[in-house]
Swiss-Prot record:
PANTHER family: ATP SYNTHASE SUBUNIT B, ATP SYNTHASE SUBUNIT B', CHLOROPLASTIC. The chain crosses the membrane at residues 15-37. Keywords: ATP synthesis, Cell inner membrane, Cell membrane, CF(0), Hydrogen ion transport, Ion transport, Membrane, Transmembrane, Transmembrane helix, Transport. The keyword Ion transport applies. It is a single-pass membrane protein. This is ATP synthase subunit b 1. It comes from Acidiphilium cryptum (strain JF-5). The gene is atpF1.
Amino acid sequence: MEYEALTGTLWDKGTFWVTVAVLIFLAFFGRKIVGAITTMLDQRSAAIQHELDEASRLRAEAEAMLKDAESRREAALAQAKDMLAMAGREAERLAADLLAEAEASARRREQMARERISAAEAAAIAEVRDAAAALAARAAEQILKETIDEAHDRGLIDQAIGGLPAALRQKAA
């Protein structure tokens, strides 16, 4: 039986016609598939770039806020010194309160900006990882398709045919 499966012409084998059908399919739709995948990856890249640009903008905004807070802090210090010259202890207490508030506000804003930047970076990294995982899965599928040969296919088919009577008996029972 195995000898019969290995003899004959190339035209008699099913794997030849499957290969021909796959090649014809790829000839007709290969560019469209590659184009669609390329478009999808370009869109994902643009989205990631947009998020990175947004993160950079937020970082610049945070730095501007920090500079603004520092300038307000310096102004508060100058005001506190003037009040210290006029009112002594009361001005000293007021300056400490303003300084603490400005520093806390600056820290909160800086922390919020850092969290936004970190979240945007994490999202971008996750999207890149997802794209890499999908690409690896497609590559593994292609490798598996290329490594399974005719002898392995015949063995699986013979095994399935051999198991049909037992499966039919179980189904009938």
